[in-house]
Amino acid sequence: EEFVDSPFSAETTKMLYSRGYLTDKNIDEELNYVQHLAHLFHQRDKKLFKSFAFLVAYNCNFRCPYCFETNISQDGRHWSKRVFSKELVDKAYEAMLLIEPQKELHNKIITLYGGEPLLKENREIIDYILKRGKSLGYKFDAITNGYDLQAYMDVLTPGLIEALQITVDGCKERHDERRTHYVMGKSFDKIIENIGMALQRGIKVMVRVNTDANNFADLHYLGQLFEQLGYSSLPNFKMYSALLRGDNNDVTSQKLKYIGAKKFHDLHKKEKFRYNCQDYGTLNKIEATIRTKKIFELHSIYCGAQSGSAIFDPYGDFYSCYQTVGDKKHIIGHYGKGILKYSDASKHWYEHNISVSHKCSHCKYGLLCGGGCLAKADYNIESGFGKSFCNDYPSVFAIAVNKAYDVLVTNKQFL
């Protein structure tokens, strides 16, 4: 009765109404409904899987100009040298059950992180972390620069460290200029060799290319190199391009030329998306929606940092976001004394969703995007997050829809 003047047939009008394209709600009612859904989705996510990581040490053997952990050096070299003790490893595993008592809700893959987790001098404590974790039913992956991998080849195996993310920043010359070993200097050749050895061990290797305007063309070079080496034909190898964000006025980043998200995706579009690029999982969700004919997966948060995940550091503190580790105002809590003590920051992180952001709650992409990365949003330790960080999701979504059409419709994979 509300849509008697509809230009569509009764059947089409009913379908549009059932899907929410037509509504009998006014603007305020729609916004209230979105906020209600945002809270429901957030509560759902907080009750689901928790992910955990060990920040083995803040120390790193590389000196990269764009590293977000550069500010950690302000605490002095000695501060970053501390490595996990066996006692703290035990307490971290105990803390995981305090954070989420239902072990079946634990992500069974624990991430090893840093700094650089797989420094050769960290081998003893890595062995202890792996041994304790395996006895408790966990497996591992690692985010590593890949330089010291030869010291870990025997534990790069199914059941222990099963996957690696390794950064390669373009051709040899450019990579060596950006990702410099603090003693040996050049690192490209050794990393490429180590990637090959890791692949031979049967584990997954994801090569990440931190991409700006200066090295975008190097994606083609790397693609050819990995084909020539036989890496690309292996099912356990992937390479993807990740947008490098930063300020071009930063004097520490003179070797870099940052670009925005729209420019980044426009460049990939010109290359007909020959290389995988960062799209926050949007393409996979669209393809899954079409294939399964189920509703698109909606979220009111950007990632697990807002739903209770924890990154344990060697000082007895834990964080929720990889990009805020070492920044004391983002400490979520403390676990080092055998009990969990949450900080005020935990409320800011774990209670933030799109409903508390005027911009995000009014955006039609809000429940698809989840509100953008909080690590890049305005933040105050007392009041929490202010203006949200928009990652140009509308253009990301439009590109993903077109890619899904090309893959599923043109190739008739949806049938």
Q: What residue ranges belong to the model's regions?
A:
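Radical SAM enzyme core and accessory elements
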Residues: 1-12, 21, 315, 355-415
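A short, conserved structural fragment
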Residues: 17-28
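Conserved alpha-helical substructure of the radical SAM core
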Residues: 29-155, 159-162
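Cysteine-centered iron-sulfur cluster-binding motifs in ferredoxin-type domains/subunits
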Residues: 56-63, 306, 360-362, 366-368
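Short glycine-enriched, charge-decorated loop/helix-capping segments at active-site entrances
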Residues: 79-83, 177-185, 380
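Radical SAM enzyme [4Fe-4S]-AdoMet core and its adjacent flexible, acidic
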Residues: 173, 177-306, 328
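C-terminal accessory region of radical SAM enzymes
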Residues: 257-293, 322-370
